[in-house]
Amino acid sequence: EVIIPNTIDGKKVTSIGDEAFYENKNLEKITIPDSVTNIGNAAFSGTAWYENQPDGMVFLGKVLYAYKGIMYGNTNIVIPDGTVSISKNAFCGYLGLTKVTIPSSLKKIGEYAFGSCSSLRDITFSNGLTDIGDKAFYDCYGLTDITLPESVTNIGNNAFEGCSRLKNIVIPDNVIIIGDAAFCNCENLSEITIPNNITNIGKEAFLGTAWYNNQSDGMVFAGKVLYGYKGVMPENTSIEIPFGTISIGNSAFCDCSNLTNVTIPNSVKYIGKRAFRNCTNIDNILIPDSVTAIGDSAFVYCTSIDNVVIPNSVTTIGENIFGHCTSLKNITIPDSITDISYGTFSDCTNLENIAIPDGVTNIGEYAFYGCENLKNINIPNGVKSIKESTFNGCKSLINITIPEKVTNIGDYAFTDCESLVSLVIPNSVKKIGYRAFENCSALETITIPNSVTSILESAFDGCKNLTIMGYKNSVAENYAKENEINFIELIKKIITGDADENEIVDVNDVTYLQRHIAGNKNTDELPLIDESNKDVFESVDLNKDGKLDVQDVTLLQQLIAGNKE
């Protein structure tokens, strides 16, 4: 038996993954909470519970998990009221299915739920449905007409791809996203009605439709979205996007290497994913202050762009948006940005200086990977982690200050930073990752505090002239000895109440003192606090009675509370 709880570690359980209990042959009873709305592919296949279910629709809680057994021709399915979602692959490939009625309680149709149901001719949706998953009706080429309810907000990738007999579609006003290839190869789809407020239309959403084939060469619009550019673009083309356009669609100008200049009007709010990907001859881009978001990889491989100003109106920039912009020298990031995502400036080999706004709290993996001419960069105080390969290959980076809130330096974080000479790790850092400073050949000194409890393998490989500065019997000293790195011992700064000797007095010192009083030992089977060290002992013997006990714990708690006030 398995009982899925409502919450795990304080987080509501909403999903059960693919093959989560697959082939668990002894599993006879399953209880799931109402919070679960998504059950993955084959999550319970091969279990005794599933084998004992009668043929037909199989439910788990309020989720239609699967259809079991043989389905004969001309089958009409009425999904019962109260069902909130249809799971991934639930009816996939059932050729006998011809009609489906969906209740108003249903919110989501999962991936491939009706995929390849080629005899499906009639589907009745009810208002209440919000999410049509990826490939939900893929290759349902028996469908000729569908009416989507006004409640729908998301049409997934490839949702109706290959529905070759579908003739017209009205996209409801509440739809926010039409996914990549959502109606691709619906070759008889000639009429498409798109609301004026939609901004996000995916790559090739209408490719291969009669509607698209009937469009003239040049810019193609779907509602107020610049959907794409059709036909062969002449050399040295300049594009002026008309005012009133509210969005540049995903991949709209992708691979338009003949595009040299583009004028974006002040009506555009969103620049889509890959919108200008690999437009290698655009050398300048002016982003108007109407834009609020720029999608992933929007300008990736625009190798001629040398200067970009992101206006204050922009609050979101996607992953890898300027990756491989090898001519980019100057970039202005506004204070409105709080997150620099994965690979944002990766391989911008000519980028020399960048000012990161103080409000930024996250710098993603590979954000500045391969920026070999980057000399200086500021990391804002709100950043809590230096992630994997964030500054890997920044060969010209001379110095960098790691802020006091950083707790982790990720794998390869500063690998091949050949010009970095010295570095001080703050007291907040607990872990230095695998090969974090590998081949920092000019690195002469690094100061590592007692807060660091883990230094992973090869963290300083190739740092031939390195001296590690740290404290006696610390992880830093042990690492230096094990790897034959020169070590200089620092004199500990004695601070009243600093039981764990990391130069920070906080609640961790209370726990440390309590553990010492209880008789806990360190890894060398020595007492946690060296009571023979007069200075250390006196710093935690707060009532000065010559012994460490619960009275000192109480005084330490009061000291910390007073510091916070």
Where are these predicted regions, by residue range?
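Structural signature of tandem-repeat unit edges
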Residues: 1-14, 25-38, 47-61, 70-85, ...
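Extracellular adhesion/carbohydrate-binding repeat motifs centered on closely spaced tryptophans
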Residues: 53-70, 214-232, 297, 320, ...
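Polybasic, low-complexity, intrinsically disordered segments
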Residues: 396, 416-419, 438-442, 454-457, ...
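Cellulosome-associated attachment modules in secreted, modular CAZymes
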Residues: 491-565
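Consensus positions within tandem repeat domains that build extended binding/scaffold surfaces
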Residues: 17-20, 40-45, 88-90, 110-115, ...
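Repeat-associated, polar segments at repeat-unit boundaries in modular proteins
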Residues: 44-47, 206-209, 479, 483-488, ...
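A short, hydrophobic secondary-structure junction motif
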Residues: 16, 20, 24, 85-86, ...
